[in-house]
């Protein structure tokens, strides 16, 4: 088999409350919204949020959602945050907005672009989301 994977197009995640998910990913984290009108017109089963050209499809469902394993990792531009103190300030802003931040955060972690400060938070469905400096 001769397959040449060149990039990631999207990841789909089920959400129990689309408005709460958009408040988290768009309003709090600043991700661009795409396909909302197409969703509302019934053309697609999701609303996308976008970071760096990569899409997360938020797929509303009434079925139970299992978020007990895995996580999403979103890169935060390091030009805006370069120190532990700055990511601590971000954590306080997220907590003030009602976002659950895991105990013991922030922490330096390795990722696709090396080691840097990161924090694990939970989205409205309890899904683990890593915000990692880049």
Please tell me what each predicted stretch does.
Residues 32-40, 106-110, 134:
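Conserved catalytic-core motifs of GNAT/GCN5-like acyltransferases
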Residues 14-56:
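Core segments of cupin and vicinal oxygen chelate
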